[in-house]
UniProtKB/Swiss-Prot annotation:
Species, as recorded: Homo sapiens (Human)
Gene expressing this chain: DUS2
A GO BP entry: antiviral innate immune response
Protein name: tRNA-dihydrouridine(20) synthase [NAD(P)+]-like
Positions with a binding annotation for FMN: 18-20, 43, 87, 155, 183, 214-216, 242-243
Similarity comment: family membership: Belongs to the Dus family. Dus2 subfamily.
Tissue specificity note: Weak expression in heart, placenta and skeletal muscle. Up-regulated in most lung cancer cells (at protein level).
Amino acid sequence: MILNSLSLCYHNKLILAPMVRVGTLPMRLLALDYGADIVYCEELIDLKMIQCKRVVNEVLSTVDFVAPDDRVVFRTCEREQNRVVFQMGTSDAERALAVARLVENDVAGIDVNMGCPKQYSTKGGMGAALLSDPDKIEKILSTLVKGTRRPVTCKIRILPSLEDTLSLVKRIERTGIAAIAVHGRKREERPQHPVSCEVIKAIADTLSIPVIANGGSHDHIQQYSDIEDFRQATAASSVMVARAAMWNPSIFLKEGLRPLEEVMQKYIRYAVQYDNHYTNTKYCLCQMLREQLESPQGRLLHAAQSSREICEAFGLGAFYEETTQELDAQQARLSAKTSEQTGEPAEDTSGVIKMAVKFDRRAYPAQITPKMCLLEWCRREKLAQPVYETVQRPLDRLFSSIVTVAEQKYQSTLWDKSKKLAEQAAAIVCLRSQGLPEGRLGEESPSLHKRKREAPDQDPGGPRAQELAQPGDLCKKPFVALGSGEESPLEGW
């Protein structure tokens, strides 16, 4: 058995709840700024996490857990290391332990989601589906408690009867977990249903471990003082806040809520500093604006198709330029240092225009790439076709490409995992140095529209179409009025 070290205290704490799409690094840091004691990341599925590699990101000063497709699944930093709890979705004890061991050196605690009622969680036997399988719950939690260095917790919903609920939580307590978070609603209930404070209180009276009360955002928590009132009503050790914190993270501030625009600007700064993908940034800002989405500010946010445009919508254009330039410069310095350490032969690159850029497929429409934009521009200007020269570095098998256009060479200082990606990066350098659009979402060249229309038809409901539609859809319907009978993306959190 591995003894848990650096135990996180769950007594008398204000906690940011795990929330899908919301609990990424910028929101967690913002909640800490405003007074949260502990912050949970969004639920991350074990099957996805066990494919990830741990990468130290020296540019951002973060630790990233990166999927095989190079997407960052989980990002954390030193500032939250002793206060962030990693929540996983799992239905298998061994997978859960593998994930816990992967992240345990970078987080303060490990939590298992046993309360999410959404189909994407329950269909895999995760989330609230676990509530009907106490044996599996016991195996998962016992395995984690014995096998990881961090305190283990779980988050549940209440069962149809108080007797069954108390029986379950007593069995959970015997696994040796450090605390239990209780969402005071049944699996089938939604935010418009009242939270059962009396059931949480009965659980708190029954257990000796800390009980964390959750589910009071709509009925109970409108301001800071309400958090303590909710804690007393449930007799809980601590309170976990979800929606109220999503709407305005300064709910944790003892001095009272800060103006929303101030909060949003602070959130955006973190999002830029930590390279948060703009679709996630946009989603979180939409949750904060809520009824104000039809305001001038809301319309600007709705139209934004990049982090730069989001910053400009909130008067942070200069901050974006300054920050991204600093990050690019840091990346260039690190790349140069890496080249020296790998012992690459020095080559004459005088006259080569260089930038630290990478090609991110998610930032471009399905039928448009920087290489296509560059080729189209060369044809329009009656220039020879771009010529790409690509080399592979033997040590790590990464690629770098130089593109020649009108006798001028362009190159990204960042090495890529494939020849195609390296060529796209070189094309971006050329386009940016010429002040030309590179085809990103929201800045497509009109001359390419015909080519897009002539491309083979794609399934309008396919995964890529849904991905591209997502940001706008999220802003059009960022939340559901409680009592409407409809479900919000955040149900169960």
